[in-house]
Design a protein with these regions (language model features):
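Concave beta-strand-loop units of leucine-rich repeat
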Residues: 1-132
Length: 132
């Protein structure tokens, strides 16, 4: 499932599982207009094959999402094969992924970069999920 769009909020109130990839582009550029996703709502999502949060266009920093500061929307997520979070310039807390991180087995399942906070796999496994 891939989302690339221009809405402020992405809501999946009944979504419990995505067997493949859940790929959410959190910003979208149309000409000079930049739209940023402000809210993700997935209160019962428990399982995802691969979780990807990135931007539609990485060529300019001003086109990357700077609104999302945490991943609390994924609090219910317990099982994920790969977590890939990139280009979220306001993101300072991965605490919402705490349950899912517990099930990750090696650093190849943790791809994080170009965010406001970028914990390593070891830091994430040790519970260092928020920027100090």
């Amino acid at each position: 499932m891939t989302y690339t769009g221009v809405c402020d909020a992405l809501r999946f109130p009944a979504l419990e599982e995505v067997t493949g990839e859940l790929n959410i582009k959190t910003s979208y550029v149309n000409g000079s207009f930049v739209s940023m996703l402000q809210e993700i709502y997935t209160p019962v999502l428990k399982k995802v094959g691969k979780l990807v949060l990135t931007t539609h266009n990485k060529s300019q920093e001003s086109w990357c999402n700077n609104v999302l500061t945490n991943l609390d929307c994924f609090r219910a997520l317990e099982n994920v094969g790969v977590i890939n979070i990139e280009y979220q310039l306001g993101l300072v807390s991965f605490k919402g992924l705490e349950k899912a991180i517990g099930g990750l087995t090696d650093d190849t399942s943790w791809v994080v970069g170009h965010n406001a906070y970028n914990p390593t796999f070891e830091q994430a496994k040790n519970g260092e999920l928020e920027q100090n």
